[in-house]
Amino acid sequence: LCVATLGMVLGSVTVLRWRLDQDPDLNLDLSDVTEPIPALDIHHDRGPVRVSYEYRIQQSDARAFMICMQDMRRVRRRGGGSNWAVYEDILQPGIFVETFVVGSWMEHLRQLERYTMNDRKIQTRVQAFHQAEQMPIARYLVAPE
């Protein structure tokens, strides 16, 4: 019992010393995200859904891009994404595809609703590496029924 009490006291002191909200740039306000409009008549509970984004990156920026993508990985996983990965196209150098899976179409829409301003800042840093006039190509793949 004494050990538990000591642990609680030390935990309380630690929380006061190292607060999670000390980052002055941390902005957890929700960000407006445009929801994709499916061309298929899809039920919200249909899934799983594989989401992918295709980026065109200069080879000289590949290493820095992958470092930024680790922050994007945390955003996707925090939002409920699993099986996150980035692949490089061996037939078209400079094409990188980010991919992750969510349980259903509704889960992905909810993921977008939880997108914060901090998430948007990370996404903007990642997209700064993208070397095309259009935004990265997004694909939403659902398992056939």
Task: Show where each model-derived region lies.
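Symmetry-related core transmembrane helices of the 12-TM Major Facilitator Superfamily/SLC fold
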Residues: 1-14
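Helix-loop junctions on the cytosolic side of multi-pass membrane transporters
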Residues: 15-26
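An amphipathic, aromatic/His-enriched active-site/gating alpha helix that lines ligand/cofactor pockets
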Residues: 23, 74-84, 101-137
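Non-transmembrane accessory domains of multi-pass membrane transporters/channels
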Residues: 31-76
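Short, well-ordered beta-strand segments in beta-rich or mixed alpha/beta enzyme
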Residues: 48-56, 85-114
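Short, highly charged
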Residues: 61-90, 94-100
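A short beta-turn/loop motif at secondary-structure boundaries
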Residues: 87-93, 129-130, 143-144
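Long, low-complexity, Ser/Thr/Gly/Pro-rich intrinsically disordered segments that act as flexible linkers
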Residues: 137-145
